[in-house]
Amino acid sequence: MAAARGEFAAHGYEGTTLRGIARAASVDARLVHHYFSGKDEVFAAVMEIPARPQELVMGITSGDPDGLGERLLRTFFSVWDTPQGRERVIALISSVTSSESGARMIREFLTREIFARIAAVIGVDDPELRASLAASQMVGLMMARYVVRLEPLASADPEDLIPFLAPTLQRYLAGDKD
């Protein structure tokens, strides 16, 4: 994991490869592939994200497109709204706000591995813009709820938040521009 952390820090998410990680760790690339199906899983392990990104995206994108925003939020809260998840959110946000390399890694990961995949699956126009809008909403939620602890948002039950947040995410991801 130290070699992977070093590669992500030096090259960002986009510039890091599984072969580069293997080289830095002085192991055969097949060993890395044995434990991780892709770069997204290595990054999730390095950042201690308690879920597999591909599984999250599959769960979010399966089902009726009209429920996309709600499924995104339910998935988000199931991963992050636990004591362990909150600690990891705070660590992620800290890395984003304290260094450009941390910000670049998180930005590239969120846009490429989560939100761009969601937008691509639903086949909408301007998928990159939509992905970044959805990511901005979710990063803002993470910051306000877990880091700043803005009340009553910080202590609200997720079920009370979903009806307010889901329509905005739905419009960002799948709604009309008009």
Task: Specify the residue positions occupied by each region the protein language model found.
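Amphipathic alpha-helical segments used for helix-helix packing
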Residues: 80-103, 107-108
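Hydrophobic/aromatic-rich alpha-helical bundle segments in the mid-to-C-terminal region
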Residues: 103-108, 118-172, 176-178
